[in-house]
């Protein structure tokens, strides 16, 4: 389609605004999005002029350009629903923008999307892209705190003995409330007092999910309430990042830098790999994710899209009727985002997905092996690099085995359609018909480097080794 035919029925105002459009994909969709916006802005005196000023002078201060917030917060453009600030940031600034998780409002914005006001600002220059936080290096002591004659191998073997025979269950959002004001409620060796005995467990001193102001009432494509409560003065819109300095391990003054080895985090080429299983059988090759936005669905995609892991393509001679039926219900599956050092899972399937993430469970105060149900249309943060960094920094002072135990946190298991755990007749993930295992490469490689620096559990590092 040439430019002449594209603009043949567009108004002069829409033509002008499309002149600042970024990228060359989805021309017709962008035109419809801008046309819908122009119709709204024409009702407000000076709004069109303010938007044109912002687009033509990106480095100059500009005012909010607002439209009324819809009931569910989303805007429909040509059969596709999305959040308005995401739509217009995609049109005029970042064509590769995948999700609201990647955006943060600037301080000058009076009507940011996350503030839940009647008007929402769509000025693309009132938002910035989230950057991954810089994780402080882990400082590994050069000398062991342990007696070299004392072996921790027996303790190492028994680390999992306190785990229940089968995992407990929790349902999002019913079992999930905002954690209390401390973003990291537990130490790595603490118990999990808020373990959900059932899907109705709640947190003390936090709003229930039925509260009209609860962020969990919002659709999956809205900003996650996540890690900081609304009463915290630094996060009116939940947008401020945690101070990475709080992650830095504090060293006793008598320890000088020569007594520790700094091990830094490095972002790998592939942020994760995904392996698909049917019952206890691995099916097909591992999928290596290079894009920060990955779809795992039940369809077939002969184009070999690098952003999609299509389970419908995979064959298995041992497949039974239960597996076949479950595969038919995977549908659109799950959307995995890796943004700003955090991993989110959004259930796009009509059926629920079930997630076992120790990092997510730690954040919410659940038992480590709890399985969380994510219904259709909901999204949940399932891993946080900063919390992992804090745990790793603490664990190096407790020995090799404690650090090694964190490898379990770097693997996330997720089943489609059928759940497992105490509330289901399937007790283990290997009893579910269709499931995936997600390996987080960055945290795993970081752990590997720290463990290499520490030495082996059979021969702890010491002043005489």
Swiss-Prot record:
Residues 12-136 form the MH1 domain. Residues 221-232 have a biased composition (Pro residues). The modification Phosphothreonine is found at residue 322. Zn(2+) binds at residues 64, 109, 121, 126. Residues 271-465 form the MH2 domain. Phosphorylation of the C-terminal SVS motif by BMP type 1 receptor kinase activates SMAD1 by promoting dissociation from the receptor and trimerization with SMAD4. Phosphorylation by ERK2 MAP kinase in response to EGF or HGF prevents SMAD1 nuclear accumulation and transcriptional activity in response to BMP. Dephosphorylation, probably by PPM1A, induces its export from the nucleus to the cytoplasm. Dephosphorylation is inhibited by association with EGR1. Ubiquitinated by SMAD-specific E3 ubiquitin ligase SMURF1, leading to its degradation. Monoubiquitinated, leading to prevent DNA-binding. Deubiquitination by USP15 alleviates inhibition and promotes activation of TGF-beta target genes. Dephosphorylation, probably by PPM1A, induces its export from the nucleus to the cytoplasm. Phospho-SMAD1 is ubiquitinated by CHIP leading to disruption of the SMAD1-SMAD4 complex. GO terms for biological process: anatomical structure morphogenesis; BMP signaling pathway; bone development; cardiac muscle cell proliferation; cartilage development; cell differentiation; gamete generation; hindbrain development. Found in a complex with SMAD4 and YY1. Interacts with HGS, NANOG and ZCCHC12. Upon C-terminus phosphorylation: forms trimers with another SMAD1 and the co-SMAD SMAD4. Interacts with PEBP2-alpha subunit, CREB-binding protein (CBP), p300, SMURF1, SMURF2, USP15 and HOXC8. Associates with ZNF423 or ZNF521 in response to BMP2 leading to activate transcription of BMP target genes. Interacts with SKOR1. Interacts (via MH2 domain) with LEMD3. Binding to LEMD3 results in at least a partial reduction of receptor-mediated phosphorylation. This is Mothers against decapentaplegic homolog 1. It comes from Bos taurus (Bovine). The lineage of its organism: Eukaryota, Metazoa, Chordata, Craniata, Vertebrata. The gene is SMAD1.
